[in-house]
């Protein structure tokens, strides 16, 4: 295997070590069915993190996806409550997610303002819209909208060939986004845009169209996550995506993406999602409080990112150490 997959292999090895270590504490962690079906608790983070990787590779960022999930979730509930057939309500919810992404892209392209600032604004815009819809539907505060058909609420809890449906959808997204980013001309354009937007523009690369596609895909993935979460919990709430921001960005960075753009890996992000998700699961099964598990997750991110930085710059570090050895301080 080529050296460029070295980081992904290191993450995979770390994932195996993590599972074995938690399995030594609690043998249930080594049960295959438990490992597969526990992914339903966190795999929606991965569904959003995959297209987010491409946005970050392009030199942008989107921190509004959590609010997009909440808006799409409550919109699905309101549509169903209003008598819209469930298939049509799901389709309209997916279109709403893509529209949220296009709003982000349009504001970024035409205002030339930093994507972090724009998506911070839309984060509050979409969150406020979700609360407004929730209030209009009579679901005050964070009270959910329920009463969905059993066929819909069972969907996210089904399994096909022994695999839970949310995990299957994640694997399909993984394949599609990996092929698009790493095996197509359009995907190569994303890397070029992240490395130098000006050069990409002068090279006749459709920068604006590419950015619209990337942010729309992130919005669409957020809507898919919203539909799965509503099905999984049986309730549409405006706060469903509130806790997704940091885990998703952590997975993208941990997976090898450069936060300044120009490099990243879909496979790396996918493995990092499992790494972070199983870390939380393992700590909970070990009886560790949530506050401590969050701190440990942050510590893991710091250690791994520092390790990756050392790995990437090991030649410069060796040269610096050699110079210090030859010229010791008095």
Curated annotation (Swiss-Prot):
It is a multi-pass membrane protein. CDD domains: TM_PBP1_transp_AraH_like (cd06579). It comes from Escherichia coli (strain K12). Keywords: Cell inner membrane, Cell membrane, Membrane, Transmembrane, Transmembrane helix, Transport. Part of the ABC transporter complex LsrABCD involved in autoinducer 2 (AI-2) import. Probably responsible for the translocation of the substrate across the membrane. Residues 26-42, 137-159, 231-237, 280-285 are periplasmic. It holds the Pfam family BPD_transp_2. This is Autoinducer 2 import system permease protein LsrD. One of its GO terms (biological process) is quorum sensing.
């Amino acid at each position: 295997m080529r050296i460029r997959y070295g980081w992904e292999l290191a993450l995979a090895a770390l994932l195996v070590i993590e599972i074995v270590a938690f399995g030594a504490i609690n043998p249930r962690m080594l049960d295959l069915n438990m490992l597969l079906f526990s992914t339903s608790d966190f795999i929606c983070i991965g569904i959003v993190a995959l297209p987010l990787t491409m946005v970050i590779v392009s030199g942008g960022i989107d921190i509004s996806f959590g609010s997009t999930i909440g808006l799409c979730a409550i919109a699905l509930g309101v549509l169903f409550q209003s008598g819209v057939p469930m298939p049509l309500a799901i389709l309209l919810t997916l279109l709403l997610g893509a529209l949220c992404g296009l709003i982000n892209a349009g504001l970024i392209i035409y205002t030339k303002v930093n994507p972090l600032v724009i998506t911070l604004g839309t984060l509050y815009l979409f969150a406020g819209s979700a609360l407004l819809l929730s209030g209009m539907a009579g679901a005050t505060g964070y009270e959910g909208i329920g009463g969905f058909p059993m066929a819909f609420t069972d969907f996210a809890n089904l399994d096909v060939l022994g695999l839970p449906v949310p995990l299957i959808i994640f694997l399909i997204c993984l394949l599609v986004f990996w092929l698009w980013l790493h095996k197509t001309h359009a995907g190569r354009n994303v890397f070029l845009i992240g490395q130098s937007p000006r050069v990409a523009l002068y090279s006749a690369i459709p920068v604006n169209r590419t950015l619209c596609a990337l942010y729309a895909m992130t919005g669409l993935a957020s809507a898919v996550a919203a539909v799965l979460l509503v099905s999984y919990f049986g309730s549409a709430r405006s706060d469903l995506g509130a806790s997704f921001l940091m885990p998703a960005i952590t997975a993208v960075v941990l997976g090898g993406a450069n936060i300044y753009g120009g490099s990243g890996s879909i496979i790396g992000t996918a493995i990092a999602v499992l790494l972070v998700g199983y870390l939380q699961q393992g700590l909970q099964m070990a009886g560790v409080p949530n506050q401590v598990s969050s701190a440990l997750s942050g510590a893991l991110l710091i250690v791994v990112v520092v390790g990756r930085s050392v790995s990437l710059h090991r030649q410069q570090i060796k040269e610096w150490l050699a110079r210090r050895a030859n010229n010791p301080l008095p």
